[in-house]
């Protein structure tokens, strides 16, 4: 079920046309990873689709290298504040038929810094949006999650440790205030 109707999706969908409408986030992050200021502006962007492997080749170039340093500081701040990082392997699932029998293949994809950069940039933009909504007293949906339940390793390793940490995470809930 589409989130928006076909007419709206054609107007505002990312990468559907040559130029797409967007909200662009400019975020000033200090050395401790805290947001010191931000700007949210309507913009027009040209979307270029890349695989994570293609993006990986661009990670050392600007502006991605500078963006990576900013998102690294933000991630370190979140870690020091107690954020849980559940690092599950990304997998590609393929189903094919062999002699009229379905064959399911799993391929474990390597962890890539480009994938982490995208995730951390989205978290940072979400934090700026939340700060804006709070400052302007706008009703805004927040995902709220209490700390994990006690009784587990605070620094799990390996796949089994990550599954155990995920099981200790209480369900998140949606709220309109932080």
Identify the residue ranges that each predicted region occupies.
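Electropositive polyanion-binding surfaces
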Residues: 1-178
């Amino acid at each position: 079920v589409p989130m928006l109707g076909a007419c709206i999706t054609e107007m505002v969908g990312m990468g559907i046309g040559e130029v797409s409408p967007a909200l662009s986030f400019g975020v000033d992050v200090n050395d401790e990873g805290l947001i010191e200021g931000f700007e949210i502006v309507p913009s027009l962007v040209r979307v270029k689709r890349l695989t994570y492997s293609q993006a990986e080749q661009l990670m050392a170039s600007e502006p991605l290298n500078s963006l990576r340093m900013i998102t690294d500081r933000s991630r370190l701040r979140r870690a020091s504040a107690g954020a849980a990082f559940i690092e599950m392997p990304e997998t590609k699932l393929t189903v094919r038929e062999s002699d009229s029998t379905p064959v399911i293949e799993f391929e474990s994809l390597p962890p890539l810094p480009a994938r982490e950069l995208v995730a951390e940039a989205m978290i940072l933009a979400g934090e700026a949006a939340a700060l804006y909504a709070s400052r302007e007293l706008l009703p805004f949906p927040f995902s709220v999650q209490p700390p994990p339940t006690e009784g587990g390793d605070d620094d799990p390793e390996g796949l089994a440790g990550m599954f155990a940490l995920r099981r200790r995470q209480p369900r998140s809930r949606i709220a309109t205030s932080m």
